[in-house]
Amino acid sequence: MDTEYEQVNKPWNELYKETTLGNKLTVNVGMEDQEVPLLPSNFLTKVRVGLSGGYITMRRIRIKIIPLVSRKAGVSGKLYLRDISDTTGRKLHCTESLDLGREIRLTMQHLDFSVSTRSDVPIVFGFEELVSPFLEGRELFSISVRWQFGLSKNCYSLPQSKWKVMYQEDALKVLRPSKKKASKTDSSV
């Protein structure tokens, strides 16, 4: 799948106006394309799409993300797409790490999955694996960094995820034990 993104500098007010117009994606159902808005996930509204074909695929996903933190905070994170129709929150796609102190314009041409029109399809876009080199960057994020769309009126609970921004020293502590285990097994061989 081709993913393009750019990060540009613009005044926050201008970006906010652009983003409030709504992020959209194009859903292909059978032979027809239909634009679907991405809604902040604290709104429980789901969008109903005319289900005329057997399978639904997604293409031409365009997302504009305004800076949520100061660029000086140095916060980065990956944008995940998850199917939340069950508690596992199956990963459908993940971008590379993005600087969340800048505007992000993300374009995804085609996603490598399809879903049956007979099933409910709640999809959530959200930032995960957030990292900051500064201690102040830990508590800067909330549910507002998630978007959702769905083909059902049912409400779904989001899978549990860690929303705290990880401090880089903490990240190193998490990685060190696995490196030690690997070195012990290497020495015993």
UniProtKB/Swiss-Prot annotation:
GO biological process, one term: transport of virus in host, cell to cell
Location(s) in or outside the cell: Host membrane
Listed GO MF terms: RNA binding
Alphabetical keyword list: Host membrane, Host-virus interaction, Membrane, Phosphoprotein, RNA-binding, Transport, Viral movement protein
Major subcellular site: host cell
Post-translational modifications reported in the UniProt record: Phosphorylated.
Family: Belongs to the tombusvirus/aureusvirus movement protein p22 family.
Name of this protein: Movement protein
Organism field: Tomato bushy stunt virus (strain Cherry)
Organism taxonomic ancestry: Viruses, Riboviria, Orthornavirae, Kitrinoviricota, Tolucaviricetes
